[in-house]
């Protein structure tokens, strides 16, 4: 056994906590000017700047992860505690179609109690849109007591995480070799976290969630349903609902697995009672995922001479046109955590955006699809998180290029080849952006002009000149028809959005129906393509030119963030890798705004709405998307103004909080422009006048005030 920890490397002491800036020689001296506090914040978690010792940096990052997990558990505990203490969860569980979820009651201070709207069932509070109630029901929570217990459990886990963070930094800190043992890490993460994690969740779903939800769907009072541990301990209870449970594990070991198809199903579509995915489908899914990951977690070579070796795989990975291929990348990914993080963020960010799209097209929890506010919030939330992670990927890729890239070890491999033809990449991408920008915007301008001239027959629309998204429609159609060939026992396709005419409504509200795509979607999809390509252009240019450019050949010496290349070199401001991340963030915001607008209007126009006894669907905005969203004027008038006016005029009602937030958000946005539009010199002059006045009155501060640096000002601006 290899000993891969060091015992008692750093003694535990609170002394450093009393010395702000202890991690930096310069900052530890204390403040001379007000810039000190900004540098303190900028560098406190920049472990690279504290030491060059990769082992020490790795330990700090590892330890910080436990701190992060502790915070997450505390936050989660708070959510569950609110559900237990301040919510109408039990009432909602009894009647989820008429009662809205609420877990916050505003205290009557200076009239704020106006925010407590009537959410049904005699409960007054703020309606929540986080989806927690739906998750709780799906996992089989039937009482507020269970929420209390889970909240306490989360706090215990938080304490464990805090202890682990301390222990693995101060008592038993891993050696560098442990952090670099990628095969062992892959085996443990794949088999342990993802494999056993999915397996335990599948077990919970089968033994606890499924029976409880089966009874809830049948209309049994939550108070009459047996408690979770009773289902686990008493097999008879489960056998009443799923007779094959009486046979135990015999069918498993005799390979007669179809016996289990009562609770491990492959139905497709949605449960008509709840409007969510069949929970028997999701249990089956998690079991299958668990098997895959448990196998994957045994594929990498560690102590025995079988299995994959990452270094060998990467070095063998050469194509006919790619030079040395992946040679040298193994060394990068085991010595630069920025490079590793960049890849992980890019993948996790993309995955998060995929999750955003699955939350509405395959709503995973009961009664989620008919809770429109929550659907909108979850989509927005996952799109934003995904956007931040992808921009973060570019940021850390650029930091890797500046701090960790060693050109002498990377010759003619893929990274080197990409860097050598970066001009071709960036100029082609730039051309793509110009093309997409002019053409997508041009289609709208054309429509606005024709509309203004009263020539509807000359517009691009479903009723005039059609630009149908034929490829998207083909994909939809293929997926709608696929199950009949690939899964003959399935009753529906993976998602109702593909087509096929099915409609699921719960409590006279539409849960989901086939989403039609037309000219309007074709137009806005090209705006999506445009904004995404511009974001990529800015971020990729920042990474590829992080070390050098024709303008500043020695850029790497200036670091990741710098305002300009010194005095006497005009036109070299705002070229640092940091500035590219800054600009990329703005375009990420642009891109996501259009996505959220598109989703919000499309769903209200073509999916969400009420259904009459005769089966007639009335959509929230009456299906106006196809004809209104094809002009810029239509977006402004029929979406932005039509939706915002209700919020703006909300004062005096329980919605007023949203009106104030709306106003406040625009105030914050305007505040950000103050930092972005004014120059540093302006503020420095102003400060010096004010300091002069203080000197006159002999109240001058010991710490000299200074204007924000250019980079700091832009950081404050983009944050707001």
Swiss-Prot record:
Chlorophyll a' binds at residue 666. It is found in: Plastid, Chloroplast thylakoid membrane. Its EC number is 1.97.1.12. GO terms for molecular function: 4 iron, 4 sulfur cluster binding; chlorophyll binding; metal ion binding; oxidoreductase activity. Phylloquinone binds at residue 683. SUPFAM superfamilies: Photosystem I subunits PsaA/PsaB (SSF81558). The keyword Cell cycle does not apply. It catalyses: reduced [plastocyanin] + hnu + oxidized [2Fe-2S]-[ferredoxin] = oxidized [plastocyanin] + reduced [2Fe-2S]-[ferredoxin]. GO terms for biological process: photosynthesis. P700 is a chlorophyll a/chlorophyll a' dimer, A0 is one or more chlorophyll a, A1 is one or both phylloquinones and FX is a shared 4Fe-4S iron-sulfur center. The PsaA/B heterodimer binds the P700 chlorophyll special pair and subsequent electron acceptors. PSI consists of a core antenna complex that captures photons, and an electron transfer chain that converts photonic excitation into a charge separation. The eukaryotic PSI reaction center is composed of at least 11 subunits. This is Photosystem I P700 chlorophyll a apoprotein A1.
């Amino acid at each position: 056994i290899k000993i891969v920890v060091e015992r008692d490397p750093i003694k535990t002491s609170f002394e450093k906590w009393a010395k702000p800036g202890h991690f930096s020689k310069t900052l530890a001296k204390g403040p001379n000017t007000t810039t000190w506090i900004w540098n303190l914040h900028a560098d406190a978690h920049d472990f690279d700047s504290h030491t060059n010792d990769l082992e020490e940096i790795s330990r700090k990052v590892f330890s910080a992860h436990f701190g992060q997990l502790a915070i997450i558990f505390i936050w989660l505990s708070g959510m569950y505690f609110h559900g237990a203490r301040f919510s109408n969860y039990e009432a909602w569980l009894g009647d989820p179609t008429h009662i809205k979820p609420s877990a916050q009651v505003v205290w009557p201070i200076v009239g704020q109690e106006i925010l407590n709207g009537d959410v049904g069932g005699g409960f007054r509070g703020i309606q929540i849109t986080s989806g927690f109630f739906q998750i709780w029901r799906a996992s089989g929570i039937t009482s507020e007591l269970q929420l209390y217990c889970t909240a306490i459990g989360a706090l215990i886990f938080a304490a464990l995480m805090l202890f682990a963070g301390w222990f693995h930094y101060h008592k038993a800190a891993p050696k560098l070799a442990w952090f670099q043992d990628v095969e062992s890490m892959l085996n443990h993460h794949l088999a342990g976290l993802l494999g056993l994690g999915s397996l335990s969740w599948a077990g919970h779903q089968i033994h606890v969630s499924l029976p409880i939800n089966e009874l809830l769907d049948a209309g049994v009072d939550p108070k009459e349903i047996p408690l979770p541990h009773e289902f686990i301990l008493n097999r008879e209870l489960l056998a009443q609902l799923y007779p094959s449970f009486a046979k135990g594990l015999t069918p498993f070991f005799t390979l007669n697995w179809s016996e289990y198809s009562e609770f491990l199903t492959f139905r497709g579509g949605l449960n008509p009672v709840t409007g969510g995915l069949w929970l028997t489908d999701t249990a089956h899914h998690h079991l299958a995922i668990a098997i895959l990951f448990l196998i994957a977690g045994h594929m990498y070579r560690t102590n025995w001479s079988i299995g994959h070796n990452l270094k060998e795989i990467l070095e063998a990975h050469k194509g006919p046109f790619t030079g040395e291929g992946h040679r040298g990348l193994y060394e990068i990914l085991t010595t630069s955590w920025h490079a590793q993080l960049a890849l992980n963020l890019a993948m996790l960010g993309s995955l998060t955006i995929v999750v955003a799209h699955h939350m509405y097209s395959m709503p995973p929890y009961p009664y989620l699809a008919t809770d429109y506010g929550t659907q909108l919030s979850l989509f927005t939330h996952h799109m934003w998180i995904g956007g931040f992670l992808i921009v973060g990927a570019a940021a850390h890729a650029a930091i890797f290029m500046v701090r960790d890239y060693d050109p002498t070890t990377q010759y003619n491999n893929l990274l080197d080849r990409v860097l050598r033809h970066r001009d071709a990449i960036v100029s082609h991408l730039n051309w793509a952006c110009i093309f997409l920008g002019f053409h997508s915007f041009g289609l709208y301008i054309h429509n606005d002009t024709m509309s203004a001239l009263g020539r509807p027959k000359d517009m691009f629309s479903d009723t005039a000149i059609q630009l149908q998204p034929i490829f998207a429609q083909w994909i939809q159609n293929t997926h709608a028809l696929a199950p009949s060939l690939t899964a003959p026992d399935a009753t529906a396709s993976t998602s109702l959005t593909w087509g096929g005419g099915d409609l699921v409504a719960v409590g006279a509200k539409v849960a989901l129906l086939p989403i039609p795509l037309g000219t309007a979607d074709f137009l806005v999809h090209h705006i999506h393509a445009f904004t995404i390509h511009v974001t990529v252009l800015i971020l990729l240019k920042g990474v590829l030119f992080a070390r050098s450019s024709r303008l500043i050949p020695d850029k790497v010496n200036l670091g990741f963030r710098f305002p300009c290349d010194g005095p006497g070199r005009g036109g070299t401001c705002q070229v640092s890798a940091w500035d590219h991340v800054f600009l990329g963030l703005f375009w990420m915001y642009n891109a996501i705004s259009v996505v959220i607008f598109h989703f919000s209007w499309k769903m209200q126009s073509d999916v969400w709405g009420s259904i009459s006894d005769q089966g007639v669907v009335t959509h929230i905005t009456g299906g106006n998307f196809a004809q209104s969203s094809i002009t810029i004027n239509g977006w402004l008038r029929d979406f932005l103004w039509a939706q915002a006016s209700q919020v703006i005029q909300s004062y005096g009602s329980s919605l007023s909080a949203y009106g104030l937030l709306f106003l406040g958000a625009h105030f914050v946005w305007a505040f950000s422009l103050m930092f972005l539009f004014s120059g540093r010199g302006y503020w420095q002059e102003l400060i010096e006048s004010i300091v002069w006045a203080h000197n006159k009155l002999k109240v001058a501060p010991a710490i000299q005030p200074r204007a924000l640096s250019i980079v700091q000002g832009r950081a404050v601006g983009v944050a707001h």
